[in-house]
């Protein structure tokens, strides 16, 4: 099978690796893969070393004539079976480029919300009539997309991004950096804060936690609107604002558990995956794909979205029972390895592509 990918690989290594390694594995299995991306992306050297053809081609805007011309020439002359676009810039350009070629256009969707039939821009991406199939990062995203597509709802499918535990094995950040010891119980929340992240719910939940050994680390940017709420928390002195960090996986490995109080918009949260890979359990909400990663009462806790008291209750269950933290953490790591592994992702992609080619 001959496949052309249009995506960006200029993000953090851990964020692009599940996607990038999938295409490398396809080449190892005998498929021909070409990737159109920024030529200076860090992953380009690895792609080429592994036999992936790379074209230095990335659109500057949603309709970029130069990109369309380059991709059309590649699709036409290369006789590709599948072309696969990953974002709001690459999908429209790939759609125009695929006109007059035999390539089936597949798109990727990674978040819930934001796709509407009344929005003209949606017809440049997932609602474009050229789209033959949509691959979603979670069942929550799939169900959301199916509400909005006009036809072929059965060709909107879930394929989880695959992971390998070895990708995430990192040394733990030292607790002493935050003035903490092994006697303390630590929860970490990593986010680039916006309203959908539910930080107010988390801070409200701290009003219902009463354990002097419990500390909360808030990792990332954008917490400023919540400073007054944090000051009003009874455990304000044990809430640590540590800013943007390059070692988030190491912090997750150090924490006893991680918390994600999101109220909307989540696809399949990477912070939960990084925590699972390092054997760290989670407290999450029912929004988006989080419940697909966390088995409630087995690998962590899933609580109703926006319910601060329920969130606090789940945290308290872990704070007061370290054996449960250990039990859930082991189970979380095993679940990631079993249900979200890279080999399954490649298998499901190829099966879906083959299905589209038969139609």
Annotate each predicted stretch with a short phrase:
Residues 55, 130-147, 151-169:
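Donor nucleotide-sugar binding/catalytic pocket of nucleotide-sugar-dependent glycosyltransferases
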Residues 168-180, 329, 348:
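A short helix/loop element that forms part of the nucleotide-sugar donor recognition site in Leloir-type
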Residues 35-41, 163, 190, 194-196, ...:
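Glycosyltransferase donor-sugar binding loop
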Residues 295-297, 301-308, 317-323:
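Conserved acidic donor-binding segment of nucleotide-sugar-dependent glycosyltransferases
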Residues 36-37, 281-284, 294:
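Short hydrophobic beta-strand element within catalytic cores of glycosyltransferases
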Residues 13-24, 185, 189-208, 266, ...:
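A conserved mid-protein helix/loop that constitutes part of the nucleotide-sugar donor-binding site
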Residues 227-245:
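Nucleotide-activated donor-binding/catalytic signature segment of Leloir-type glycosyltransferases, i.e.
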Residues 85-91, 109:
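Short His-centered aromatic/hydrophobic patch
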